[in-house]
């Protein structure tokens, strides 16, 4: 029996919605990353984008355990001398709450062209509403 390898044109994409209200950040991110990669499907192939679309709502209500809200550090670098910028989740949540979940999921997908392609299927919204009702997404409970 030969090993099955999915072809990109054979992959059928579905839409899923995850409500992140009062859920732990990492638990939501793991579930989203697995669906984006297609690891929940029987046709999973590591080098093919066989994942589905994921909508995460209520990103502003996601929970961090312990003292991570103040102690965890996100760093970025502009490329210029002295261009290192450090943020805590509290600052990021005040400025753009969706970014916390986007960064968490981004760290869980491959850091390649395939991972960037998979990240385009992630839609994160701070509030409870989203503009993708026409796709009839399936709700996922954690």
UniProtKB/Swiss-Prot annotation:
Matches recorded under NCBIfam families: rplM_bact (TIGR01066)
Assembly notes: Part of the 50S ribosomal subunit.
Alphabetical UniProt keywords: Ribonucleoprotein, Ribosomal protein
Cited HAMAP family: Ribosomal_uL13
Database matches in SUPFAM superfamilies: Ribosomal protein L13
GO CC term (a single one): cytosolic large ribosomal subunit
One GO process term, biological-process aspect: translation
Role of this protein: This protein is one of the early assembly proteins of the 50S ribosomal subunit, although it is not seen to bind rRNA by itself. It is important during the early stages of 50S assembly.
Name by which UniProt lists this protein: Large ribosomal subunit protein uL13
Record InterPro entries: Ribosomal_uL13, Ribosomal_uL13_bac-type, Ribosomal_uL13_CS, Ribosomal_uL13_sf
Gene3D superfamilies reported in the protein's UniProt record: Ribosomal protein L13
Family statement drawn from the similarity comment of this UniProt entry: Belongs to the universal ribosomal protein uL13 family.
Recorded GO MF terms: mRNA binding; structural constituent of ribosome
């Amino acid at each position: 029996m030969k090993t099955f390898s999915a072809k990109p044109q054979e992959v059928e994409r579905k839409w899923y919605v995850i409500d992140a209200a009062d859920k732990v950040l990492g638990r939501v991110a793991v579930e989203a990353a697995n669906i984006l990669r297609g690891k929940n499907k029987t046709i999973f192939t590591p080098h093919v984008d066989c994942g589905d679309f994921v909508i995460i709502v209520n990103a502003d209500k996601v929970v961090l355990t312990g003292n991570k809200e103040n102690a965890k550090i996100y760093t970025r670098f502009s490329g210029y001398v002295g261009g290192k910028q450090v943020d805590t989740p509290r600052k990021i949540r005040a400025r753009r709450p969706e970014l916390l979940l986007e960064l968490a999921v981004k760290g869980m997908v491959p850091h390649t062209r395939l991972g960037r392609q998979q990240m385009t299927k992630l839609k994160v919204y701070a509030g409870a509403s989203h503009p993708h009702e026409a796709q009839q997404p399936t709700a996922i409970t954690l």
